[in-house]
Swiss-Prot record:
Its cofactor is Mg(2+). One of its GO terms (biological process) is phenylalanyl-tRNA aminoacylation. GO terms for molecular function: ATP binding; magnesium ion binding; phenylalanine-tRNA ligase activity; tRNA binding. This is Phenylalanine--tRNA ligase alpha subunit. It catalyses: tRNA(Phe) + L-phenylalanine + ATP = L-phenylalanyl-tRNA(Phe) + AMP + diphosphate + H(+). It is found in: Cytoplasm. Transmembrane segments: none annotated. The gene is pheS.
Amino acid sequence: MTDLNTLEADVLAQVAAASDLQALDAVRVAAVGKTGSISGLLKTLGAMSPEERKTQGAAINALRDKVQDAITQKKAALEAAELDARLASETLDLSLPAPYRRKGSVHPTMQTMDEVVAIFAEMGFAVAEGPDIEDDFHNFTALNFPEKHPAREMHDTFFFNPKEDGERMLLRTHTSPVQVRTMVSQKPPIRIIAPGRTYRCDNDATHTPVFHQVEGLVIDKGIHMGHLKWTLETFLARFFETDAVTTQFRPHHFPFTEPSAEMDVQCDRSGGEIKIGQGTSWLEILGCGMVHPNVLRACGIDPDEYQGFAFGMGVDRLGMLKYGMPDLRDMWSSDVRWLSHYGFSAFAAPNPASGLS
């Protein structure tokens, strides 16, 4: 019979000498595994007399329990030592500056577009959209443009190559085709705005070949210029966030409205900066008018029963005026410094109830 005291001392010495979890597990298998030294002693109990089995069985089980407790304690100590070593190697100096991560921002044009849409949505306007590539009917003919109107020429409009039947598709020069499509597909009353990109052959400090518009259309019975005036003045007061907006309407000509007007706002131009609601100067800000009867007829609406007004404004230009951006071309220069200066936080979603900007 193996000397249990000697075996105990030997196994406990091996447990104490284990330097890592892998070595400790090898000691465990050798001692109390299925073929381990202590497990082997338990298998010899069957050949002993009842008295001897009782005495030796208790001693062997006590040895096994003592070894397992020693292994458990050693394992906990080794795991704690490994954790301490890993934490020491991963020490973070909290006094170091955090790494710089460049933040993106909402483009001023998109912010302005969202502001305009939010205001008109609160006024009961629905948003309508249409394709950027249009045909001549929706972009010109249905809007009462004469056949020889200058806007139909190549120097003012981006045309595609003619089709086999001679038809030329084009990049829309305004979002008015959306109004036409709405009047054709819906019955009055109609109250929509049409935001989107538009395209013209123009490029200077206040014009770009690609720009953004929001046009509005109201069709119903008994509509007149007073409704148009109130709508636009209410919008401008909300957009510029001031009740001091003073406006004037100047007679103008648009093929698709009659009468037509350009709307000016009073402003202060001193100091190289335009301030709306102050000063004695005037600034043209949008075009508008009563929908021409020919446009209503082209869309299948009886002008003797229904009237309407329409308006259109450049979103990029509105943003320039509100946020003091001097050159429209800078908006599309991809200058990160400019975008960082004039951009908006992604969390600053326009909301008329809590403020637009």
